Amino acid sequence: MFRAAAPGQLRRAASLLRFQSTLVIAEHANDSLAPITLNTITAATRLGGEVSCLVAGTKCDKVAQDLCKVAGIAKVLVAQHDVYKGLLPEELTPLILATQKQFNYTHICAGASAFGKNLLPRVAAKLEVAPISDIIAIKSPDTFVRTIYAGNALCTVKCDEKVKVFSVRGTSFDAAATSGGSASSEKASSTSPVEISEWLDQKLTKSDRPELTGAKVVVSGGRGLKSGENFKLLYDLADQLHAAVGASRAAVDAGFVPNDMQVGQTGKIVAPELYIAVGISGAIQHLAGMKDSKTIVAINKDPEAPIFQVADYGIVADLFKVVPEMTEILKKK
């Protein structure tokens, strides 16, 4: 039996929706916006109400201008100061709190990247609310879905906090359109520098390959490769596929590759069109980071390897024979 909502209930629901407002904290590198921010904006629009974006940095005019064109954003707030170099959470938190106080946002969110995971717990603590991490769906303005038990179960969380603070899994939401928007831009609230931490420098690994979390094709290697030198087999294959290269935690812990290549529950979450797992057994922690891939190909000489349970295609063979053969075939095409 269906029961119609009373007119009064509908009016109250509509009134609540009008008062919803969300602040998205933009992650960027001054001259370019991190792709996960566009996914976070899409999630924010699902909440209803007005969506604003806060951009803090040293020379972030270009990012602010780009955000004004993104569909779904009503306002872009810009804060430029030397203390925001490196986007340190100690400096960003007072800025976010001042912005929230000025506009009375009901929701504050960022992508579930290293940036968001570092920043939002501090913001939530200062607001005296409990944060919700790594959401994959939004059911209503106060109800969210996230994974638990390494992705083997879904947990629906109802949040009654005065301000909802949450991080968004980028692979669970489409990227917002980068055109069609007409947001206004204005200066954000000014705050005094905290200066308890200082940004010194960062050294980034340069690569001509796509960034791991945004690549359409990912080739990942595990302990089965036996050494870091053997990862060259994957690099050669990836070059033919214009793919990013990842690794399991076992390969990272063994010192084969740096930890920024790790895919899994404690690494990066990816959902490419094609994921090729080479010499990876398929531990539950690794599956949590890649099982949303559209097509999964597994190469392993052990037919009982758990990776085959989630793979769309499996090759039971010696990777040291199969991978070079695949590379040679692709070179001829």
UniProtKB/Swiss-Prot annotation:
User: Residues where N6-acetyllysine occurs?
Assistant: K59, K62, K69, K75, K85, K101, K139, K158, K164, K203, K226, K232
Q: Which InterPro entries match?
A: DHS-like_NAD/FAD-binding_dom, ETF_a/b_N, ETF_a/FixB, ETF_alpha_N, ETF_asu_C, ETF_asu_C_CS, Rossmann-like_a/b/a_fold
Changing T266M has the effect of: In GA2A; decreased electron transfer activity
The answer to whether UniProt assigns keyword tRNA-binding to this entry is no
Q: Which GO terms describe its molecular function?
A: electron transfer activity; flavin adenine dinucleotide binding; oxidoreductase activity
User: What PROSITE patterns is this protein classified in?
Assistant: ETF_ALPHA (PS00696)
Cited function: Heterodimeric electron transfer flavoprotein that accepts electrons from several mitochondrial dehydrogenases, including acyl-CoA dehydrogenases, glutaryl-CoA and sarcosine dehydrogenase. It transfers the electrons to the main mitochondrial respiratory chain via ETF-ubiquinone oxidoreductase (ETF dehydrogenase). Required for normal mitochondrial fatty acid oxidation and normal amino acid metabolism.
Protein name per Swiss-Prot or TrEMBL? Electron transfer flavoprotein subunit alpha, mitochondrial
